[in-house]
């Protein structure tokens, strides 16, 4: 049996743990730079606030309904996630952390009753130890566990956060009530294909011939069909899958037209992306830089410029990556235009252990030692204690986060004081 554990409205729940007066109130969490809504409490969902809603467009709705607004505090959310996952790992050894708020479990050697009991114990313990509410779906396959979790979350008064698809009747009922677009692994393109032949529910999908599914949705689609039929084709992934590309992008608080300001932004993004690259012990050999206008302007005032270039050598050095990124920026920059967003994407990733030395390598060992020293200082004293020359030395541009909560669990001077 497989279980899918999902933290309910995770970001909003994290804020409520340390501010219990928020219970029952609508909450929205905003993206980087306080741009768009990326998470909502159930109360906010009930107000019709959609995911991705531009914050400025919903300002009056927020005010009228007394919506509590928070800037995204990923330091807090990441730490709370680690605590939740640590608790879960005490119950079952076979754990796959799927995302910041989701994990799969495999119950090998458990009877059905034992697995049910263990799931309910996890819900109770996570709530008691962290204050985070979780829902669990249990089923014979990972794909069905996802659907079982959906049932558990949709009917909390009946399920109390736990639902098990443990027989054929429950499986068929759940598949009959879920649309193809809501099935994990279907995707937008496949949903369109299925809709074109009047396949709109999970039941419709599993009734398709295997040959059609394999031909039109590849072997991956066929595996999904088998999963929904109750035959496991996906197992717990215990090894960490490294990212195939790394991006750092931001919208600006106000439009930027100066090349100097854009260089500072791209350099800072390069430093952040390079650090992510080193954290997963990878190197890149391709870089894409883009700049674009405000998407809410008139059509004739919208523009997007991007350029991708190949490095002469693989690297994870902030110095080399930022230098190359700035060169790309200068090629796409246009005067007399204003820009609202910029970003850098690192591609062509490979393990740093596979590095092949070439004539183009520039004191590679010296740069590795330098990057290691910078990372050590950053980890100990915070980001940007050591900066590149093209980063602003008087101030480092920071995201607009006017509604940021405290780092209750990671900063000693921000912990709650009990009087």
Predicted regions and their residues:
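Short Gly/Ser/Thr- and Asp/Glu-enriched loop/turn motifs at secondary-structure junctions
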Residues: 98-102, 139-142, 282-286, 337-341
């Amino acid at each position: 049996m497989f279980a899918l554990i999902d933290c309910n409205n995770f970001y909003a729940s994290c804020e409520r743990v340390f501010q219990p007066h928020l219970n029952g109130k609508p909450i929205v969490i905003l993206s980087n730079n306080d741009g768009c809504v990326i998470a909502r409490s159930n109360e906010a969902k009930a107000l019709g606030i959609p995911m991705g809603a531009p914050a400025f467009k919903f300002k009056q709705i927020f005010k009228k309904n007394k919506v509590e607004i928070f800037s995204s505090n990923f330091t807090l959310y990441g730490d709370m996630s680690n605590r939740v996952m640590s608790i879960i790992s005490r119950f079952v050894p076979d754990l796959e952390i799927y995302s910041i708020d989701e994990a799969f479990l495999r119950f090998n050697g458990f009877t059905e009753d034992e697995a049910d009991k263990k799931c309910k114990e996890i819900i109770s313990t996570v709530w008691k130890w962290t204050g985070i509410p979780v829902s669990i779906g249990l089923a014979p396959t990972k794909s069905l566990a996802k659907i079982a979790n959906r049932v558990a979350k949709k009917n909390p008064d009946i399920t109390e956060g736990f639902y098990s698809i443990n027989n054929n009747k429950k499986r068929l009922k759940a598949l009959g009530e879920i649309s193809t677009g809501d099935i994990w692994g279907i995707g937008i393109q496949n949903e369109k294909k299925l809709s074109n032949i009047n396949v709109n529910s999970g039941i419709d999908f599993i009734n398709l011939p295997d040959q059609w599914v394999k031909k039109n949705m590849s072997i991956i689609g066929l595996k999904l069909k088998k999963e929904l039929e109750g035959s496991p084709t996906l197992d717990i992934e215990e090894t960490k899958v490294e990212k195939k590309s790394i991006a750092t992008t931001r919208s600006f608080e106000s439009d930027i037209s100066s090349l100097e300001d854009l260089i500072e932004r791209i350099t800072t993004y390069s430093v952040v992306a390079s650090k992510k690259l080193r954290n997963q012990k990878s190197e890149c050999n391709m870089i894409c830089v883009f700049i674009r206008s405000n998407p809410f302007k008139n059509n004739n005032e919208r523009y997007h410029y991007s350029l991708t270039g190949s490095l002469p050598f693989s690297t994870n050095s902030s110095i080399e990556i930022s230098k190359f990124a700035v060169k790309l920026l200068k090629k796409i920059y246009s005067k007399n235009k204003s820009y609202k967003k910029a970003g850098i994407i690192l591609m062509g990733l490979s393990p740093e252990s596979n590095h092949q030395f070439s004539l183009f390598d520039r004191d590679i060992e010296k740069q590795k030692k330098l990057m290691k020293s910078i990372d050590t200082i950053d980890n100990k004293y915070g980001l940007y204690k050591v900066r590149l020359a093209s980063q602003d030395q008087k101030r480092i541009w920071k995201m607009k986060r006017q509604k940021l909560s405290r780092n209750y669990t990671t900063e000693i001077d921000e912990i709650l004081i009990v009087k």
